[in-house]
């Protein structure tokens, strides 16, 4: 599984992406060029900063928010976004809280967000932008057309990276069946997989921001990267040293900086191959990835096969009787494994994706 990065901002964006009632209200204020200051949450910390205004406790509606924003004061909305608690309120945050914002509205929003850890939205009257604050986080909501253009550009980049990854994996598949895999081939495949997954993360952020307008991008993304992460994890499992936990190795690879990811030796070290020459070190796959592509073979049987034979090549060379004695494998399943591996090999030789 991917490490969860920027969860605070992701959770915040979910409640105000296009298609939501809150976003509709924000867009109305933006178009009216009135500006506005909205606080999400009516807990004690927030209400202690509120001075004046009038209490409403009215049901939330985008048109109500738009009308109330015509007044100078802030609007406080309940945590569940169902009630407008009060309007035209003056917010008085702790003046000692440091902020580098310049406008009065944005300085107040930043301080309130830091002081209460609630979501505060400042809508600029002159610059016509929506800025979201939560704790120390500041995020400027972009127009859907801008995000859509960037998302489409990212999808095009992803297509090229996936194409390169497929070539690298096809080459690795061929070498695995010939038992000629080098450490260089393995770390290159892992590097390329991680590069693809980082672009996927970026596109997922765009999809989150686009809300219901990001459906087509989401469909394209799912089609492009169906099993890439799963195969990448199995690749790490195939080649990391016995005493290494493959999920921990995957987490460490995700934590590599962009510059470190370009260093193949750094990836090799994480797999447990410190100081080994990449091109000259022959390395055999355990077989989790390839055996996982054989139809109707449970993961427990794959585990038993690898425990018995240690390497993929030994499984490939084993005859039916040798396969039959492995726990969980009868005559029918032994034949299915042999036939499945034969079909996979033929597909690889025809340079087809498996």
From Swiss-Prot:
Q: Which organism is it from?
A: Clostridium botulinum (strain Alaska E43 / Type E3)
**What EC class does the entry list?**
transferase
> MF terms per GO, please?
adenylate cyclase activity; ATP binding; diadenylate cyclase activity; DNA binding
Subunit structure, as described in the record: Homooctamer.
Q: In the Enzyme Commission scheme, what number(s) does this protein have?
A: 2.7.7.85
Q: Which reaction does it catalyse?
A: 2 ATP = 3',3'-c-di-AMP + 2 diphosphate
Q: What is this protein called?
A: DNA integrity scanning protein DisA
Query: What SUPFAM superfamilies does its record include?
Result: RuvA domain 2-like, YojJ-like
- Cofactors demanded by this protein: Mg(2+)
* Function, in words: Participates in a DNA-damage check-point that is active prior to asymmetric division when DNA is damaged. DisA forms globular foci that rapidly scan along the chromosomes during sporulation, searching for lesions. When a lesion is present, DisA pauses at the lesion site. This triggers a cellular response that culminates in a temporary block in sporulation initiation.
**Family matches, as InterPro entries:** DisA, DisA_sf, DNA_integrity_DisA_N_sf, DNA_integrity_scan_DisA_link, DNA_integrity_scan_DisA_N, DNA_integrity_scanning_protein, RuvA_2-like
Q: Name one GO biological process term.
A: DNA repair
Coding gene? disA
For this chain, the family text in UniProt reads: Belongs to the DisA family.
Report the residue ranges that make up the DAC domain in this protein.
6-144
One Pfam family for this entry, by name?
DisA-linker
Positions binding ATP in this chain are 73, 91, 104-108
Q: Which UniProt keywords apply?
A: ATP-binding, DNA damage, DNA repair, DNA-binding, Magnesium, Nucleotide-binding, Nucleotidyltransferase, Transferase
Presence of keyword Metal-binding: no
């Amino acid at each position: 599984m991917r490490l969860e990065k920027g969860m605070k901002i992701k959770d915040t964006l979910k409640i105000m992406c296009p298609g939501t009632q809150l976003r509709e209200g924000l867009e109305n204020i933006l178009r009216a060029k009135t500006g506005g200051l909205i606080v999400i949450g009516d807990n004690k910390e927030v209400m202690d900063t509120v001075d004046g205004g009038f209490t409403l406790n009215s049901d939330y509606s985008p048109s109500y928010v738009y009308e109330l924003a015509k007044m100078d004061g802030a609007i406080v909305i309940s945590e569940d976004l169902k009630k407008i608690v009060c309007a035209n309120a003056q917010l008085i945050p702790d003046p000692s809280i440091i902020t580098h914002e310049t406008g009065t509205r944005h300085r107040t929003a930043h301080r309130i967000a830091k002081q209460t850890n609630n979501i505060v939205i400042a809508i600029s009257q002159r610059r016509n932008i929506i800025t979201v604050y939560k704790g120390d986080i500041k995020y400027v909501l972009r127009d859907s057309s801008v995000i859509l253009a960037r998302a489409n550009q990212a999808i095009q980049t992803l297509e090229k990276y996936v194409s390169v990854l497929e070539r690298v994996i096809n080459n690795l598949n061929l070498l695995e069946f010939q038992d000629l895999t080098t450490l260089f081939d393995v770390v290159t495949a892992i590097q390329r997989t991680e590069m693809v997954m980082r672009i996927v993360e970026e596109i997922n952020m765009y999809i989150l921001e686009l809300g219901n307008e990001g459906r087509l991008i989401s469909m394209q993304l799912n089609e492009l990267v169906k099993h890439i992460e799963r195969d990448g994890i199995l690749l790490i499992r195939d080649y990391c040293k016995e005493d290494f936990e493959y999920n921990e190795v995957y987490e460490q690879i995700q934590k590599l900086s962009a510059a470190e990811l370009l260093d193949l030796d750094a990836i090799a070290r994480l797999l447990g191959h410190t100081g080994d020459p990449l091109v000259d070190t022959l390395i055999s796959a355990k077989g989790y990835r390839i055996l996982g592509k054989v139809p109707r073979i449970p993961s427990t049987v794959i585990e038993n096969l690898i425990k018995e034979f240690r390497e993929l090549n030994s499984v490939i060379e084993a005859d039916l009787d040798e396969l039959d004695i492995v726990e969980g494998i009868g005559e029918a399943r032994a034949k299915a494994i042999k036939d499945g591996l034969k079909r996979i090999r033929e597909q690889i030789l025809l340079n087809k994706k498996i």
